[in-house]
């Protein structure tokens, strides 16, 4: 946040916090390391050596399958549980993932904007001669592990989801997962504390849970289900944010998060600003670090009016789900009374249950009091929430 509407302590919030992102980095890169090592060892060893390395003799001179290995056997359609009973062909199928290297999608991650690592050549050591290949680094929060963290409901569920993460396909076109690599359990252990939401507060002492942050463009863009469930046990009203606008973040909130969690919203709070609507109306480009153009600092009702269809489409998207909509006009100091009133009146005509000007950035909680009252009033009205499609439909039908 910013101004008088922010979560504190800001320095802890932005610098490590409780280390959730670092746990994701370690978990993701562990998977990448296991993937590269598996490819290398399968090239260097025959089936028997691979099998013996995966299922070594214990102190009593016997081999035993771990629970993870039994899951892999089940996936392969092998019902035997004694390693000594497997045929030569079954041992080969069990031990060899036979990964098609051109299909590997699991790169490494780092929580630094280091552009020189975006594309790299790995395996350059003398012990890895002949195993060099191109790879790269992505930003940590883009990891699928972050998306899983936000969708999980408990440790068991998280363990199962980690096991289903696809890292590549084999030469038969079948998915190779973290479960196949044997790392899903280790990843879960590394994430055992990250599954716990972080409790922080606003400048005025309102509790705020901070947990997970998958991107809305490549993942689903929501805070965690666990954080929402805990918050609902502690407060009368819970406000949870979805990334981006009603055309992506809100739809993923409904289509993905609500389906998995079973939580149904009573109200959609649609945030709009005069500045953004002027941009949608054809205003000049806003460049970071440069002064705003006069169109954004002076009253310009025509430009603002031209951008209102954008807000209308967002409101319509929300109303399709049968949920009451309250438009929050997030007012800046440069907005004129005529401009904010134009947005407010237009929002009501679009079908919003209410539209309220909010000055929380400048005035804190007092500046958002009328908005809060409008949201409470809307929450007391019946909500007729519905999903727009059943999961059984084809992708084409859903779209």
Ranges and model annotations:
Residues 1-399:
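Flexible phosphate-sensing "switch/lid" loops adjacent to ATP/NTP-binding sites
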């Amino acid at each position: 946040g910013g101004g008088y509407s922010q979560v504190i302590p800001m320095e802890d919030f932005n610098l490590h916090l409780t280390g959730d992102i670092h746990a994701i980095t370690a978990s993701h890169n562990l998977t990448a390391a296991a993937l590269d090592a598996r490819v290398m060892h399968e090239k260097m060893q025959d089936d028997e050596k691979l099998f013996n390395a995966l299922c070594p003799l214990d102190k009593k001179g016997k081999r035993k399958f771990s629970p993870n290995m039994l899951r892999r056997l089940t996936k392969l359609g092998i019902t035997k549980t004694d390693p000594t009973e497997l045929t030569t062909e079954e041992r080969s199928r069990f031990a060899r993932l036979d990964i098609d290297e051109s299909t590997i999608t699991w790169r490494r991650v780092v929580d630094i904007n280091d552009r020189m690592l975006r594309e790299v050549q790995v395996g350059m050591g003398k012990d890895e001669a002949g195993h060099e290949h191109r790879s790269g680094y992505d930003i940590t929060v883009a990891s699928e592990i972050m998306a899983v963290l936000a969708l999980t409901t408990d440790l068991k569920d998280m363990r199962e989801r980690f096991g289903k993460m696809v890292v590549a396909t084999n030469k038969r076109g079948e998915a190779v997962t973290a479960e196949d690599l044997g790392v899903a359990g280790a990843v879960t252990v590394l994430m055992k504390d990250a599954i716990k939401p972080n409790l922080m507060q606003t400048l005025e002492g309102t509790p705020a849970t901070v947990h997970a942050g998958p991107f809305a463009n490549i993942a689903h863009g929501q805070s965690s289900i666990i954080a929402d469930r805990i918050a609902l046990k502690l407060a009368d009203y819970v406000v949870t944010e979805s990334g981006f606008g009603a055309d992506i973040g809100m739809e993923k909130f409904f289509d993905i998060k609500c389906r998995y969690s079973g939580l149904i919203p009573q109200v959609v709070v649609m945030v709009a600003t005069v500045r953004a609507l002027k941009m949608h109306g054809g205003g000049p480009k806003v460049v970071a670090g440069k002064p705003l153009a006069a169109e954004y600092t002076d009253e310009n009702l025509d430009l603002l009016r031209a951008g209102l269809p954008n807000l209308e489409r967002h409101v319509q998207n929300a109303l399709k789900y049968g949920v009451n909509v309250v438009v929050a006009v997030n007012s800046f100091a440069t907005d004129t009374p005529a401009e904010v009133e134009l947005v407010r009146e237009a929002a009501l005509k679009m079908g919003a249950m209410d539209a309220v000007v909010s000055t929380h950035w400048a005035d804190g909680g007092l500046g958002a009091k009328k908005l809060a009252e409008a949201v409470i009033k809307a929450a007391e009205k019946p909500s007729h929430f519905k999903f727009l499609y059943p999961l059984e439909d084809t992708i084409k039908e859903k779209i």
